[in-house]
Amino acid sequence: MLQITYSKKAEKFLRKQDKATQHRLFTAISKLPLEGDIKKMQGVSGYRLRVGTYRILFDVNGLIVDIIDIGNRGQIYKGV
């Protein structure tokens, strides 16, 4: 079984979202790293998952999935 950890930035973003958006994001995260529109990021380590207009940046270390950041499509890559 995979363990999922969240950065403070990711937790903060999730808390600010409405319940429907939170549900969509948590559902997508629960299926990591097996399903979804997943691509390896270029220039940095890690992967990105597309969930509608949101992007989830994560890394996989053995049985641990680290959620690095979550954000809107246009703004998520600026901090990376």
Where do the protein language model's features map onto the residues?
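Basic, amphipathic "hinge/linker" alpha-helix immediately C-terminal to the N-terminal HTH DNA-binding motif
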Residues: Y6-A10
